[in-house]
Each structure stands twice: as C-alpha cells, then as structure tokens.
Amino acid sequence: MAGGLMADLEAFRKAQRADGPATILAIGTATPPNAVDQSTYPDYYFKITNSEHMTELKEKFQRMCDKSAIKKRYMYLTDEILKENPNVCEYMAPSLDARQDMVVVEVPRLGKEAATKAIKEWGQPKSKITHVIFCTTSGVDMPGADYQLTKLLGLRPSVKRVMMYQQGCFAGGTVLRVAKDLAENNRGARVLVVCSEITAVTFRGPSDTHLDSMVGQALFGDGAAALIVGADPIPQVEKPCFELMWTAQTILPDSDGAIDGHLREVGLTFHLLKDVPGLISKNIEKSLVEAFQQFGISDWNQLFWIAHPGGPAILDQVEAKLNLDPKKLRATRQVLSEYGNMSSACVHFILDEMRKSSNEKGCSTTGEGLDVGVLFGFGPGLTVETVVLKSVPLQ
C-alpha cells in the first residue's frame, strides 16, 4: 500500500512539472508620454527646482548629463505636477505622502499598459495567465501593485501573485529567475512578469554636498516592461523569442554600501560609491565562468549581450575588462540612449530591442544571429543577477 502511494506521489510530482525549459513568449513596453531632452535637461532641472543661483553646480550637472550617453528620457513628472508639489523639488523636504499618492496609481497603470501589449502579442486569452510577478522600486502599498494590476487587467481572482518591492536595478534579472522556476515547476503555467518604475520617488533638487544624488537625477527615467513566460509552448500558437537556460544571483565581495537607497519622509534617497563600475568589471568574469563553463563557452564574444545600463562608465569598463567587441553592447547602449536608466525594466527593453533589430537585419536568430547569450542585472548590494539565454531561430 505504502509503495503504491509513493509511486502515485512520484507520478503526481512529475506530472506537475513542465517537460521543457521556460521561454519568453512575448514582450511589451510602455513609457509616460512626457519625453525629456537630455541636452537641455540641466536648464529645466535647475529652473523647476529654483536652483538657478547654483551656477557651478549646474555646470557640473551639465557635464554629468553630457557624459551620460543619454539622448532622452521619459518622465511622469511634468511642470504642472512639480509646481503643485514644491516639496518634491527641494533637496530634502518631507514629501513622501505626495510621492506615494502619485506612484501607487501610476506604477500599476504604466504596468498595465506594457502588460496589455505583451498579452496582445502572446495572442492567448488573459484567463490563461496563472501567475503574476510585479516588481517596482517606486513606492510601497497594501494591497500591492500586483493586486492593482490584477484588477486593472481583469485577471482571474485565483491568479497566483508575487510582489517584489525595493529591489533596485538588478531586479530585471530576479523576475526572470523566479518566473523560470514558476514556469518549469508548474505544468501549463503562464507567468505575467511586469517591472514598472517611476522616478517620482527619487526626484529632488540639487545638493552641492551630495553629488551622488545628482548622478541619479542625470540618469534615471520612467518605463515599464512586461513579459509572458511559459514552458512547453503550444506549437504554431505560441511563438517564443528566448529560452531561459540558467540563472544565478550573487553579492559581490567588498561591495557593502556601494549602492543603496532608503525610503524616508523625503522620498527614496539614493547613494552611490564612485567605484561601482570598478567593482562590477573586476568581478564580472567570475560570474561568466560560473554560468558558461557548463556549456563549454569561454569566449565572451561568442555570446549576445544584455547588460543593465547603470551608466556609460559601467558599460565601458565591462567592455574593456572582457575585451568585448563594441558591437556586443549595441542594444544595451541604444536603450540607455533612448530611455535612460529605468532600473528593473531596462534589461527587458533591451531584449525587446535585440529581437526586433535581429529580425529587421535578417539575422538567423533573435540573438543577433548567435545561439547563446547573457543577461546581467546590477544593483544594490552590490547584487548581480546572471541569466543564460538561448535565442530562437528566425524564419
């Protein structure tokens, strides 16, 4: 009797799991309508924050923006909103209530916009979505943005939700790692993944004693990305664009306090050590070896690349340290240029850009003609997320 029960349980457990690896079945992106030109942003920023008298600081900020490799960004915050909320424009004025009122509405709304596009591309009824993963570093609320998104989209009340708050810039990799586990361990699961980021929590006026805060003001932009992740795609119905082969997360040695953020009465404060690019470039090869040794790959130029674009210095130092062909980070640099640093959403914008440009250029795969690639998320900790991707042939 016991033996029969154990055999039944074993069969039951096996039946619960998918046969194949998790795949990305669709990608959707969204931004607020308000686009900001990076070249003129210092003039706007110092004017709207009543800081035009700080001329030397403005010149420093202009240099930061000029060196950022960003052409434009999108922002929910407009002149009207900032004029109605003067405390948001000061360097350290109590303003959390005003910021929260904005993001608890706008984060799920922008997430819905991206999710609607992903669901449309996927082409299946939204009732087939079994799980939701929602990620944001913009505000906190109960019930969370995952709940709000479920309501906004009209998903089934029984959908299984995971909410990730305050993870930061590495979390575009985190959500893929968790989605992979959900898809592969629940046969038939279809996971809606949404990362939605709004800089209304971090925007503040300049300070000549906290230049690291100004780095964030020069880099961060708003955006949301959504993916549908599932294993065993239905032939001729679902069209995967990437497979999720392997994932890892690690905390870099000697990196305590390199990047951190604190939610305070003044909003989300952002702190950064100068040597973040050095810490990442010094340790990145170890992550690559750990990921690709098992696949017999040791030439990093054989891979297609998606790296979180924390800023141009990180990309430049990674490129130099690994002797990467400059073309490897093309998609990454393009997204940085067109959108800025959108925290967790960035790597999904880059995936979208890569598969679209691969198709337009007539490449043989979604990974710029290559079979295997790497996705890196970098953020507070310093935490690094590594995702090994397999591309899909393009007909």
UniProtKB/Swiss-Prot annotation:
GO terms for molecular function: naringenin-chalcone synthase activity. Its EC number is 2.3.1.74. GO terms for biological process: flavonoid biosynthetic process; polyketide biosynthetic process. It catalyses: (E)-4-coumaroyl-CoA + 3 malonyl-CoA + 3 H(+) = 2',4,4',6'-tetrahydroxychalcone + 3 CO2 + 4 CoA. InterPro entries: Chalcone/stilbene_synt_C, Chalcone/stilbene_synt_N, Chalcone/stilbene_synthase_AS, Polyketide_synthase_type-III, Thiolase-like. Keywords: Acyltransferase, Flavonoid biosynthesis, Transferase. Pathway: Secondary metabolite biosynthesis; flavonoid biosynthesis. It is an enzyme of class 2 (transferase). Pfam families: Chal_sti_synt_C, Chal_sti_synt_N. The keyword Transferase applies. The active site is at residue 169. Belongs to the thiolase-like superfamily. Chalcone/stilbene synthases family. The primary product of this enzyme is 4,2',4',6'-tetrahydroxychalcone (also termed naringenin-chalcone or chalcone) which can under specific conditions spontaneously isomerize into naringenin. PANTHER family: CHALCONE SYNTHASE (PTHR11877:SF14), HYDROXYMETHYLGLUTARYL-COA SYNTHASE (PTHR11877). This is Chalcone synthase 7.
